[in-house]
UniProtKB/Swiss-Prot annotation:
Species this chain originates from: Arabidopsis thaliana
Chain spans, region Disordered: 127-200
Ranges annotated as biased composition (Basic and acidic residues): 165-175
Family, similarity comment: Belongs to the FHY3/FAR1 family.
Positions of SWIM-type zinc fingers: 674-710
GO terms of molecular function: zinc ion binding
UniProt induction comment: Up-regulated in hypocotyls by far-red light treatment.
Entry keyword annotation includes Membrane: no
Pfam family, one: SWIM
BP term (GO), one: regulation of DNA-templated transcription
Tissues expressing the protein: Expressed in hypocotyls, rosette and cauline leaves, inflorescences stems, flowers and siliques.
Protein name, per record: Protein FAR1-RELATED SEQUENCE 12
InterPro entries listed in its UniProt record: FAR1_DNA_bnd_dom (IPR004330), FHY3/FAR1 (IPR031052), MULE_transposase_dom (IPR018289), Znf_PMZ (IPR006564), Znf_SWIM (IPR007527)
Length: 788
């Protein structure tokens, strides 16, 4: 489903700023070579280009005439084949990552058409800053001012020259990596710590030289040495902190260097928040984009770091990228942590393994796996799923929740669940796990194992915590899936970080996050909010803004989440049946009881959907159509949208050929309005509210347009099979989509077994029903050639 960002004008103007062009024909864009270079041609919706690069060059030329600079913004990829489907080119002052940026929203977006051409389909010309004169220079990446090249003790810190090694010739003794880290060579002997022959020494800091946002380095190695030298002058020690990887290709995009007293993992640490973060630029260099110089402990200026810097091979990626760093403890010894922590008690393994083996005798499709520690062969994480869960994943695994509620409190058992939402919008179990620790390795193993158990069927979207190990594992196992942060975790961090702000800001913050409808509107309101309260330098606000695609509703609406609420808390699948105080001897019985209760609720909804008919509230044929197809719960949601559509006014604002644009406004509420685009040639429709993209159900705005156009039956593309009464057998529709014969047979076995269990349940409720069920089986058996 393709998202469409739409910016609306006022209802009285009855014209939308951005729309998809219809039948736009240009020969060579209608622009001569001279015009492209410097005439007064301005960008407009419908302008065509042969390539995205040609569009960028055109926008650069326009920017040079107008007086601003350009950066390459977001790109969007096809969910079908991963090719780039659209690109954004933005004003260089877009965002707030650097002090020079003002949150400007000016941009153009070009979209690839089926013909291979690129068409300008969205544009914003207004800037929120003063524009320069004629001849401004193109800027595709931010180029902030560089640091001067100070010297001390014959050492030069030269951020101007990429790949420049910073070496102190006055001290050539071997040093280890900063902050208690050593480079661990996997290719050497077991537990071997490498002493690289080529050694790079710590750069001596220069009096008066401090890190600042915008400082550039040729490599991450150079940045690390600079920060360590600075730390020696100021009086603290450095550790290498988190790294962040690209969701596209997995390459490292940013790194953090932190005070050695950051965190609370050891007695010597006290939660110090001082750090420096560097971000990779398109040029290959690195730039300081975030910085906190404040420490919460006493400093000791001039005190040497116990651990210096070893030279890290420069592989062209800026150093540090290809090196595994094993953290040493802070107690002075040099023993490497060879084993991971295990939060699962040893007594759990025999209990669970016995249970799994007994289940496999009853359920041929029962799956379980145990992770083994590569160092000592001990058991680590555990995953299991019965045949019902595996079958449910084939139907309702398109959007899932990785629930780690045990992390909220003092749970003694690290029990996690993977859940989906069925055609009754009820949670369904897709798998369970005991997570040994919260490392990337643990989550990577878990997601890969779940994917194997589900025959490789990948979700389109995932709701999970925003912790770095989980993010890294998700990107690696499910590339392309939209990761949405858990609402409870976002709320917790908001409560923690919004305490110092005035109540007026909190009110406007909530309004900005949860009431803006489009991406353009959110970015504009956020920019105004930050400027109003002078908060461009606030570290937390910068961080959450950079991660807005993972939690801001306006950015989530274009992705399918099967109706999982954006703002609400998702209740644990097992509720209060399994909690922190569940004793070992009762875990299995409580687990089975709660699971059976959930599945009984699902069976009741199946029965109600097939045997109960809700009352119709209109005389519209589409209501009768959807009553026949949808489950009871989903139909009521659709029915409410249909009834609410009567409270809206609809006005055509644009028409060209088969394409029309409508503005749909609520009666008595000028502020609630949305744009609907409709194609008469194929009945395709899209709405700026993006309800269909997000939930898979048509919104009241499109239904209003359909009513106006006298469309009496919904096109089949708008009736998602996953919401229908027979959604459980939807895998039959995918039989020719590349599913292997073995996986297809497994799906058929699970499907027939589930149908048979329901058949037996109803057939044994009375003697009369038993006779009827037996007769039906006999007749069916004849068709299957069971009987001769």
């Amino acid at each position: 489903m393709e998202s469409v960002d739409t910016e609306l004008t006022s209802f009285n103007n009855m014209v939308a700023k951005s729309s998809y062009p219809v039948r736009i024909l240009h020969h060579n864009n209608g622009i001569s070579e001279d015009e492209e270079g410097g005439s007064g041609v301005e960008p407009y919706v419908g302008l065509e280009f042969d390539t995205a690069e040609e569009a960028r060059e055109f926008y650069n030329a326009y920017a040079a005439r107008t007086g601003f600079k350009v950066r390459t913004g977001q790109l969007y990829r096809s969910r079908t084949d991963g090719t780039v489907s659209s690109r954004r080119f933005v004003c260089s002052k877009e965002g707030f990552q650097l002090n020079s940026r003002t949150g400007c929203t000016a941009f153009i977006r070009v979209q690839r058409r089926d013909t291979g051409k690129w068409v300008l389909d969205q544009i914003q010309k207004e800037h929120n800053h003063e524009l320069g004169g004629e001849g401004s220079v193109e800027e595709t990446t931010p180029r902030p001012s560089r640091a001067p090249a100070p010297t001390k003790l014959g050492v030069t810190v030269n951020p101007h020259r990429p790949k420049m090694k910073v070496v102190d010739e006055s001290d050539r003794e071997t040093r280890s990596c900063p902050g208690g880290f050593k480079r661990f060579k996997g290719g050497g002997g077991e537990g071997e710590v490498s002493d690289d022959h080529h050694q790079t020494q710590q750069a001596k800091a220069v009096t008066g030289t401090e890190p600042y946002a915008g400082l550039e380095f040729g490599s991450a190695n150079e940045a690390c040495q600079f920060y360590q030298a600075y730390a020696e002058v100021v009086g603290f020690r450095v550790r290498i902190g988190q790294l962040f990887r690209s969701k596209v290709d997995g390459s490292i995009t940013s790194r953090r260097f932190v005070c050695s007293r950051e965190g609370f993992q050891h007695p010597s640490r006290m939660g110090c928040g001082a750090y420096m973060r560097i971000k990779r630029q398109d040029s290959g260099g690195w730039i300081v984009d975030r910085l906190n110089k404040d420490h919460n402990h006493d400093l000791e200026p001039g005190k040497k770091n116990d651990a210096g810097m070893k030279k890290i091979p420069d592989d062209g990626t800026g150093g540090l990228d290809s090196v595994d760093l094993i953290e040493l403890n802070d107690f002075g010894n040099n023993h490497i942590k060879k084993t991971r922590e295990n939060r699962i008690g040893k007594e759990w393994y025999p209990l669970l393994l016995d249970y799994f083996q007994s289940r496999q005798t009853e359920d041929m499709g029962f799956f379980y796996a145990v992770e083994l520690d590569v160092n000592n062969g001990s058991c680590m994480s555990i995953f299991w799923a019965d045949s019902r869960a595996r079958f449910a994943c084939s139907q309702f695994g398109d959007s899932v929740v990785f629930d780690t509620s045990y992390r909220k409190g003092s749970y003694s058992v690290p029990f996690a669940t993977i859940i989906g939402f069925n055609h009754h919008r009820q949670p369904v179990l897709l798998g369970c796990a005991m997570v040994a620790d919260e490392s990337k390795e643990a989550f990577l193993w878990l997601f890969q194992t779940w994917l194997r158990a589900m025959s490789g069927r990948r979700p389109r979207s995932i709701v999970a915590d925003q912790d770095l190990p989980i993010q890294q594992a998700l990107v690696q196992v499910f590339p392309g899936a939209h990761h949405r942060y858990s609402a409870w975790q976002i709320r917790e961090k908001e409560r923690e970080n919004l305490i110092p702000f005035p109540s007026e800001f909190k009110y406007e913050y909530e309004k900005c996050i949860y009431q803006t409808q489009t991406i353009v509107e959110f970015d504009s309101v956020w920019s105004a909010l930050i400027n109003k309260y002078g908060l461009r330098d606030d570290v937390w606000l910068r961080e959450i803004y950079e991660q807005r695609e993972n939690w801001v509703p306006a950015y989530l609406r274009a992705s399918f989440f099967a109706g999982i609420p954006i703002n609400g808390t998702i209740e644990p699948f097992f509720g209060a049946s399994l909690d922190a105080l569940t004793p070992l001897r009762e875990f299995i019985s409580r687990y089975e009881q709660a699971l059976e209760q959930r599945r009984e609720e699902e069976r009741k909804e199946d029965f109600n959907s097939y045997n109960l008919q809700p009352f119709l509230q209109t005389k519209e044929p589409v209501e009768e159509q959807c009553r026949r197809l949808y489950t009871l719960t989903v139909f009521r949601i659709f029915q409410n949208e249909l009834v609410q559509s009567y409270n809206y006014l609809c006005l055509k604002t644009y028409e060209e050929g088969a394409i029309s644009r409508f503005l749909v406004r609520k009666c008595g509420n000028e502020s609630e309005k949305h744009a609907v685009t409709f194609s008469a040639s194929n009945l395709n429709s899209s709405c700026s509210c993006q309800m269909f993209e997000h939930e898979g159900l048509l919104c009241r705005h499109i239904l209003k347009v359909f009513n106006l156009l006298d469309i009496r039956e919904l096109p089949s593309r708008y009736i998602l099979h996953r919401w229908t009464k027979n959604a459980e057998f939807g895998f039959v529709r995918d039989m020719e989509s590349g599913v292997s014969a073995q996986d297809l047979k497994a799906l058929m076995v699970w499907s027939l077994r589930e149908a048979a269990s329901k058949y037996i349940e109803f057939g044994t409720s009375s003697l009369e029903k038993y006779k009827l069920a037996y007769e039906i089986m006999r007749e069916g058996g004849k068709k299957l050639c069971w009987q001769r």
